[in-house]
From Swiss-Prot:
Its main location: periplasm. CDD domains: cyclophilin_EcCYP_like (cd01920). Its EC number is 5.2.1.8. The gene is rotA. The lineage of its organism: Bacteria, Pseudomonadati, Pseudomonadota, Gammaproteobacteria, Enterobacterales. It comes from Dickeya dadantii (strain 3937) (Erwinia chrysanthemi (strain 3937)). It comes from the Bacteria. This is Peptidyl-prolyl cis-trans isomerase A. One of its GO terms (molecular function) is peptidyl-prolyl cis-trans isomerase activity. InterPro entries: Cyclophilin-like_dom_sf, Cyclophilin-type_PPIase_CS, Cyclophilin-type_PPIase_dom, E_coli_cyclophilin_A-like. GO terms for cellular component: periplasmic space.
Amino acid sequence: MSKRILAAVVTVLSLTAFSPAFAATTSTHVLLTTSAGNIELALDDQKAPVSVKNFVDYVNSGFYNGTIFHRVIPGFMVQGGGFSSDMKQKATNPPVKNEADNGLRNLRGTISMARTSEKDSATSQFFINVADNAFLDHGQRDFGYAVFGKVVKGMEVADKISQVQTENVGPYQNVPSKPIVIQSAKIIKK
């Protein structure tokens, strides 16, 4: 009898140990080295695979190196990943599917895909929420903005960026008066 119980316990434990629900969550980590300091991101490979792959492809190609945070709004977010320091927009890969319905929320410290008013228009640009922004979540007012990770180190840097003096540059508003440059973006953990 005790051998059967032991066998049953071993079987149940082995099934749950190898179940995806019990698997250790892995996330890709990216280090953004900026002129304002470093920001480390943990990307949610499981809930936002399309957005994470898109972001990682841009990181691996060196696309973000030399781009700026071109739109910063205190108490809201800091946006970057699409413009050079002279406010020239960089050519991007095709847009990706919007994953805003993945259950992740636009909370302080999360990173999301920026897009136009078109649902599936996100390319390279992203933003870091410096406040809880529930109105950007799926279904609040439209499809929403896809969260695909979070800041795990350097949130004080994002906060500092959000407080810099801004100005209008041509048609663009909320542009830092002194460029905040992403000097490099690289994968540090997979």
